[in-house]
């Protein structure tokens, strides 16, 4: 990501080459998510992984009910436009826009963030990254929109999705002179009136 807001873009492209050549970098591991779901979309079924998040979203006007279980323990049903399950890297992506917390990238957690929840007392939930998350959607609409980062598929409203941390991670170069807090300050204009 070389965009303005993407937090993986805290390294300026012009600075990367010289820092790598001079050894002024570290390699960090970023957790990836894996989904257990059949979407009918070969791109998603053959590579069921995401760096930032998986989302389920209503496909029409009817509200989406999402039953969530954490290691087999059932949570109250989320009634919302949708639900996001993100990594700590994804905490500054869609989850942040939906009111989720900012999480330092080295944190070993997953974030469950409702999208426009019907009940105002429903809040994002942070769970350990070794948690097995299962989602079951139901809606009066026939289908649900499912995404893995920016890849999209339509799945039946009764579908179930299992989400866990992948057995591999994304290797990312971080320049020694860059840090996440400075990137937050710069990109979110913290401290500016």
Model-derived features with residue positions:
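ATP/nucleoside-binding phosphotransfer catalytic cores, i.e., glycine-rich phosphate-binding loops
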Residues: 43, 48, 56, 71-74, ...
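Catalytic core of DAGKc-family lipid kinases
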Residues: 4-81
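Glycine-rich beta-alpha junction loops
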Residues: 37, 58, 87-91, 116, ...
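Short glycine-/acidic-enriched loop or helix-start segments at secondary-structure transitions
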Residues: 8-9, 95-97, 122, 173
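Short aromatic-centered micro-motifs
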Residues: 68, 90, 146
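A generic structural signal for short beta-strands and their flanking turns/coil linkers
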Residues: 29-33, 50-52, 62-66, 81-83, ...
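Gly/Ser/Thr-rich active-site loops/lids in small-molecule metabolic enzymes
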Residues: 77-121
């Amino acid at each position: 990501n070389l965009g303005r807001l993407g937090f993986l873009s805290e390294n300026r492209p012009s600075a990367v080459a010289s820092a790598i050549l001079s050894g002024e970098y570290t390699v960090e591991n970023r957790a990836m998510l894996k989904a257990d779901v059949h979407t009918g979309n070969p791109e998603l079924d053959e590579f069921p992984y995401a760096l930032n998040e998986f989302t389920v979203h209503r496909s029409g006007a009817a509200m989406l009910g999402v039953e969530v279980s954490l290691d087999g323990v059932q949570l109250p049903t989320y009634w919302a436009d949708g639900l996001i399950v993100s990594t700590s890297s994804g905490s500054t992506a869609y989850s942040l826009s939906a009111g989720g917390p900012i999480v330092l990238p080295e944190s070993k957690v997953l974030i469950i963030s409702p999208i426009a929840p019907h009940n105002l007392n429903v809040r994002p939930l942070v769970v350990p990254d070794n948690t097995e998350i299962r989602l079951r959607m139901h809606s009066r609409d026939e289908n649900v929109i499912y995404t893995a980062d920016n890849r999209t598929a339509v799945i039946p409203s009764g579908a179930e999705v299992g989400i866990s941390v992948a057995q591999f991670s994304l290797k990312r170069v971080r320049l020694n002179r860059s840090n996440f807090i400075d990137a937050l300050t710069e990109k979110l204009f913290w401290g500016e009136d």
